[in-house]
């Protein structure tokens, strides 16, 4: 479906943005999250300039995103290592099983 204009409220300001209908709930939640972040920053930093608050919030979000990407990369690397170890364990077990089967076959001849 194509994006449709949607009115949202962010930090007391009305914004009209285009959004696919199936993503409107996520957009509203994001707008609420941003509003809360801006309000928290305003209280914590005592900065009243909305533009400055928006830049600080954007930097914080970018930092959080970078941290999550790093965590995801580390997790994927860890999983790849575990999969390789599991594959090696399985291959070793199959080789040993094959050796045992070969020994048993020669005993019955």
UniProtKB/Swiss-Prot annotation:
GO CC, alphabetical: cell division site; cell septum; cytosol; plasma membrane
Gene Ontology biological process terms from the UniProt entry: division septum assembly; FtsZ-dependent cytokinesis; septin ring assembly
Pfam families according to UniProt: ZapA (PF05164)
Ranges in a coiled coil: 22-99
Cellular compartment(s): Cytoplasm
Keywords, in A-Z order: Cell cycle, Cell division, Coiled coil, Cytoplasm, Septation
UniProt signal peptide: none
Family as reported in the entry's similarity comment: Belongs to the ZapA family. Type 1 subfamily.
Role summary: Activator of cell division through the inhibition of FtsZ GTPase activity, therefore promoting FtsZ assembly into bundles of protofilaments necessary for the formation of the division Z ring. It is recruited early at mid-cell but it is not essential for cell division.
Subunit note: Homodimer. Interacts with FtsZ.
Official protein name in the record: Cell division protein ZapA
Species, as recorded: Yersinia pestis
